């Protein structure tokens, strides 16, 4: 059996411990490595000729990407999980206790357990490469750093900085890591090992303490000051998580107890809290999302199909969506993009949009001006069909007008090659209808981005009846290169995300018309776990956009999609939402941004002809909206719009911010129990009508007591 850790000795007395997990592209820590590492550490202790130790990775671009998450699924009880954490503590404590200097030479991802391993070393040096990132992202899986990270990190970089890293899971770039004292030096990769060896030869076992501001010294250096930090952090966490995520509060407690009662006590608390989180339903749900997205990355979207390489893209339309799509094509995918618009204003908008995003990166020192300019050079513009013939994919982002899209299809088939893919960014028009104008319908596909394009992770890849497998696979690969999470859905009104969102939004509108206040509605759904409430979302998306999509969904899918008639009054009053500074909420004059203290525009109640009454329980408000979404998600599965419950969960979480701690609509139905969900729907059906009728599959599952997972 191949070893993961190999120890070599240099003539100068420095030993090099290389980690290289056999058969894997990245290093991850596994429970079975414990005895192997302990044996090597014992060997080092016995060998008096070893003057220092350097830890380095044998992988090309990865130090240690973290612990192997699948280990956690093997834990049957909290006791098993606690033993796992304690095993890590023993090994890392042993490494830290070596009486020779130990230096971590870091290149590539150094995350989670990988950073905890580096923290147990006496010093750290990392490469200045863009691939090098350091962080503890465990909170994103509903966990906490369980290998001593909650104790060593605050002692190294300070409590405030450590809490910020652990509570957000943010990844730190090399220069930032040096500034905060997380690493002792940053050097080019070519001299990384040499520098680490020199540091080990210098014989220092402790690093210089990081300089702290006077305020930080006062806060972190006294029990009273530390309590202020912890209390403030706890308040912020409670506000942000709405009590839905247990990990952040436990992270704060680990640091608090460790700083008050010492490292040993802190490690004990860390192991206990880690164990509780591993077996929590929230972490199980978040880990299921992680595994689902990892699994999806290996799929082409069309079984047996090989994607063609996309060397050039054309984007039709220089508006908000077109500019965003062009931007992620050049900056993320590094693919040349040519933007075509009928007027120069649209083109300058697209260029300005991309430049502003890149310039933010320069201002934050994430890139140099030269890198920004090189990426901008990948974007070119035209008002005519010039320089488009060699495009591999054309993404259409023009108005939602079928005749216009038909014209675009004909233009592209005339101007481009026979294999050029025509991908429409429509949010509502069926792709099959757009493809009716094509002589090569196999090349036509939907590619539905969400706004703002650079922030929203999901894209829906929509195949109509004649879309070829190669077109699907190529489009999926293209979306992944843009940094997106693509789900393949079948053609149909609203596709998947907008279809399940529409009923949720409609129900919120019904509640509003029944007298629930706007603030109460939004607060109820934020408390449930959505990033924003439904009324805020309607203002953001645009009331006019909602009004345009609703009749299409009603025509194709039936009466349950009928939007409340009262909403026509909003458009008559020229209320489109944030885009024109007039919607449900008040907006600061001129910039269309919400007022600092977000306030409802009370005049909207008069426009709708309603008067807010007594607010219902938040849980009841949220339930009515959410069960509509759950019921429709199952209908989408039955209709073949989505291929699996897994895809439905990913689409809802990454497309509309369905609460990740619930694992997605299908995971949540399993948690509730199909029988319980059917009872809730039937109760509402009796009270409010057939829009709540449970779909056939849910009724079957309720009767047979079956689950999706």
Swiss-Prot record:
Cell membrane in keyword set: no
Region (3-hydroxyacyl-CoA dehydrogenase) location: 308-709
Catalytic activity: a (3S)-3-hydroxyacyl-CoA = a (2E)-enoyl-CoA + H2O; a 4-saturated-(3S)-3-hydroxyacyl-CoA = a (3E)-enoyl-CoA + H2O; a (3S)-3-hydroxyacyl-CoA + NAD(+) = a 3-oxoacyl-CoA + NADH + H(+); (3S)-3-hydroxybutanoyl-CoA = (3R)-3-hydroxybutanoyl-CoA
Enzyme Commission code: 4.2.1.17, 5.1.2.3, 1.1.1.35
Marked site (Important for catalytic activity) residue numbers: 116, 138
Transmembrane segments: none
Pathway field: Lipid metabolism; fatty acid beta-oxidation
Superkingdom of the source species: Bacteria
A GO molecular-function descriptor: long-chain-3-hydroxyacyl-CoA dehydrogenase activity
Gene3D superfamilies named in the record: 1.10.1040.50, 2-enoyl-CoA Hydratase, Chain A, domain 1, NAD(P)-binding Rossmann-like Domain
Keyword Lipoprotein applies: no
GO biological process: fatty acid beta-oxidation
Classification via CDD domains: crotonase-like
Chain segments carrying region Enoyl-CoA hydratase: 1-188
Main location: cytoplasm
Subcellular location: Cytoplasm
Cellular component, GO annotation: cytoplasm
Function: Catalyzes the formation of a hydroxyacyl-CoA by addition of water on enoyl-CoA. Also exhibits 3-hydroxyacyl-CoA epimerase and 3-hydroxyacyl-CoA dehydrogenase activities.
UniProt record similarity statement: In the N-terminal section; belongs to the enoyl-CoA hydratase/isomerase family.
HAMAP family: FadJ (MF_01617)
This protein's name: Fatty acid oxidation complex subunit alpha
Organism: Shewanella sp. (strain MR-4)
